[in-house]
Amino acid sequence: MQVLLITISLAVLPYLGSSIILESGIVNDYEVVNPQKVTAMLKGAVKQPEQKYEDTMQYEFKVKGEPVVLHLEKNKGLFSEDYSETHYSPDGREITTNPPVEDHCYYHGRIQNDADSSASISACNGLKGHFKLRGEMYFIEPLKIPDSEAHAVYKYENIEEEDEAPKMCGVKHTNRESDKSIKKASQLNLTPEQQRYLNTPKHIKVAIVADYLIFRKYGRNLFTIRAKIYEILNILNEIYKAFNIHVALVFLEIWSNGDKINLFPAANVTLDLFGKWRERDLMNRKNHDNTQLLTGMNFDGPTAGLGYVGTMCHPQFSAAVVQDHNKINFLVALAMAHELGHNLGMTHDEQFCTCGAKSCIMSATLSCEGSYRFSNCSREENRRYLINKMPQCILIKPSRTDIVSPPVCGNSLVEVGEDCDCGSPGYCRNPCCNAATCKLTPGSQCADGECCDQCRFTRAGTECRPARDECDKADLCTGQSAECPADQFQRNGQPCQNNSGYCYNGICPVMRNQCISLFGSRAIVAEDACFQFNSLGIDYGYCRKENGRKIPCAPEDVKCGRLYCFDNLPEHKNPCQIFYTPRDEDKGMVDPGTKCENGKVCINGKCVDVNTAY
């Protein structure tokens, strides 16, 4: 691996006036540095000429006359393995690509001999980002001087604010319990299942949507918008390391030919519409855990963002809206981290909440102090939320063979050649894993997993995954692995829910429940006569498709085609209702394995005998 050592000579140039205009705004006090690259090969390193950006870099420079050494590692977990982007042509055509992102230019880092330091840097065109040194936050960005390597280093407090009014989160009701009860949350008696859930690393696959206002704000330049969002996600990823939560960008959509929903200055209205669009549209196109709308809309009052509380993994409510309220990407990332915190069960901090800084991430007033720490209250609330709700989607982690870039110890992703990876030595809190080598500590059999307890394999027969319902089986540890075995189900065709259905791949598919899922809690299955539409072979009634052609149902199969329901709402009189969307025509069909008659189930659009179906 080629390692780049860059020495920055710190000739502090004379100021060209009392202030300077940078991307971040007008800065009144700054230092000018001029990076000079010096390459060196470390012992054992292998040069990889196909890489444009090195995996590991060091920068040596001075701040206030004091020398510092900044160590950087490429953030290998910034993008998911199946990352994709979508934008729209002027005539509305959807354009989706899978850009190569493994050789990207976004880094995390630390300052040598400063245990509390951190950094998030873009090295795409010079150095742009922030680093924390001796408890103070500094920003660095290239100066736009022709044929020059000059950069500016400055502190947030030296930036002139265009809008001095503090920005707020739009969440109004926190229902925070007392300081005493917050402390007690960490003393809860946990079941083995809850403890295993807490010990398992979490992975949030985030989708970002940039609206048409953002597209226009940044000169209709897709490259500029991508770079901004990559920077924000790099910071978000860094922030959530504190919870051992890995945040990866799985999808980016830019509404380049107009917004897909109506946007309103009332943040709650925009969030409601965005969540519904997410469930109706985006969830059908891209598998992900959480969606954040980055908008150019100026919300009413001081509101800079709004997110649902305690809703991670929900198809509609695992979402938030964030205003692009500041030129500094770091502050926009803090707002997004705040709203994502709401999705993860955190509410606003009260006066008794502390994080060792002037302001914490979950303060109702968004921090401009450069702090990205979570308070003791936020940590306990997140812990309690995870214990009580155990959202399952964030347990799905990438396979070590799915990670296409070279392995790097310390990025919290277990890759080929590693036993474990608990993050950098400064973040690692796992006694079973050596953070410096990504190998198990002496005597340890495992570092994490549902069947790992205190660094040892759990004894054989210990339940690691309880039965979810009557069609599922409890799964047991083998005593030979830290991983819970593959999910095992009851046999297909076993009666369930008081003979209203038959088990199918671990669930009990029943028409009534499918209607409730599509039309709400009052919905019921429509009268038998409605299902006769399935004999027509049209959009609103068919059993299956062959070569794109809709095949009508035979008379005995009509209950295995389009699902007909009645939502039971007083204002609706149509007794034959269906769910139909041209983007996903098969959504709203009767699920496979659903009971269609006594002793019969739907398989491939036919109502067949349950004893021969499987």
From Swiss-Prot:
A GO BP entry: proteolysis
Main location: secreted
Signal peptide residues on this chain, from the entry's feature table: 1-19
Cofactor binding comment, as recorded: Binds 1 zinc ion per subunit.
Tissue: Expressed by the venom gland.
Residue ranges of domain Peptidase M12B in the record: 202-398
Gene Ontology terms: cellular component: extracellular region; plasma membrane
Propeptide residues, chain positions: 20-193
Disulfide linkage: 313-393, 353-377, 355-360, 409-438, 420-433, 422-428, 432-455, 446-452, 451-477, 464-484, 471-503, 496-508, 515-565, 530-576, 543-553, 560-602, 596-607
UniProt keyword annotations, A-Z: Apoptosis, Calcium, Cell adhesion impairing toxin, Disulfide bond, Fibrinogenolytic toxin, Glycoprotein, Hemostasis impairing toxin, Hydrolase, Metal-binding, Metalloprotease, Protease, Pyrrolidone carboxylic acid, Secreted, Signal, Toxin, Zinc, Zymogen
Record motif D/ECD-tripeptide, residues: 470-472
Top-rank taxon: Eukaryota
Binding site for Ca(2+): 408, 411, 413, 415, 418, 421
Active site: 339
Residues annotated as glycosylated: 268, 376, 498
Function: This metalloproteinase hydrolyzes azocasein, and oxidized insulin B-chain. Also hydrolyzes the alpha-chain (FGA) and more slowly the beta-chain of fibrinogen (FGB), without affecting the gamma-chain. Does not cleave fibrin. Inhibits endothelial cell adhesion to extracellular matrix proteins such as fibrinogen, fibronectin, vitronectin, collagen I, and collagen IV. Induces apoptosis in vascular endothelial cells.
Protein name: Zinc metalloproteinase-disintegrin-like Eoc1
Organism (species): Echis ocellatus
Phylogenetic classification of the source organism: Eukaryota, Metazoa, Chordata, Craniata, Vertebrata
Primary gene name: Svmp3-Eoc1
